[in-house]
Amino acid sequence: MFGPLTLEGAHVRLEPLNLDHVPALVEAASEDRSNYQWVYTPAGPEQMTAYVQDALTKVASGDHVAFATVRKGGGPSGSDLVVGCTRFCEIFVWQWPPGATHQRRGVPDVVDIGFTWLSGPAQRTPVNTEAKLLMMTHAFETWKVHRVALQTDVRNTRSRAAIERIGGRLDGIMRADRPGADDTVRTSARFSIVVSEWPKVKARLTARLAAGTTRPLSPS
């Protein structure tokens, strides 16, 4: 188990996903369905409940750490507003040879960031940039992972360009990788950032936030 975790910045709070978030997530996902061409985003209470329950099953097994993405001050009268989801997934603890210098206990060696979606109004805001900064900072500086990976539909040229802009490197194309959000068999573009690259990536993300740059960075 690697959670539950709460990660908080100036614009966003990532809090442990639970079934109480379902009504707010349904509302967030209903605002503009055209935003979800490349990432599966449940529609309606039944689908959203099943989605969250599946996430919680993966959390309980230690495979995922799932968050509700909360935009601070994004709701009526400056209240906080649930605007989407994201996760640590593909969490692996490597089996090192006995006595290996890199052997650690209780933390992962590599992780993915995925299952990311946001409401339409939360896109092109600092929310996703800060969420990625919070998650990568935790992964590299608290867990001290060797690699963070991100992937997106190979056709999602906008997200691919955004990942490359912050320093993600294309590791390869995974053919027939998973179900696509558009009822196709998805081919994925897989990117990674390794620990030696993290300082430059962190600086780029921090600069994007400071400059108010809000180009999309939402792999899944």
Regions picked out by a protein language model, each given a short descriptive name:
Residues 141-151:
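Conserved GNAT acetyl-CoA-binding A-motif
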Residues 1-125, 138, 142, 178, ...:
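GNAT-family acyltransferases
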Residues 112, 130, 147-149, 158, ...:
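Amphipathic alpha-helical recognition patches that constitute DNA-binding helices
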Residues 124-138, 161:
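Conserved acetyl-CoA-binding loop-helix of GNAT-fold acetyltransferases
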Residues 156-172:
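Conserved active-site alpha-helix within GNAT-family acetyltransferase domains
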Residues 151, 169-183:
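Conserved catalytic-core motifs of GNAT/GCN5-like acyltransferases
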Residues 118, 150-160:
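Conserved beta-strand-loop-alpha-helix junction that forms the acyl-donor binding cleft
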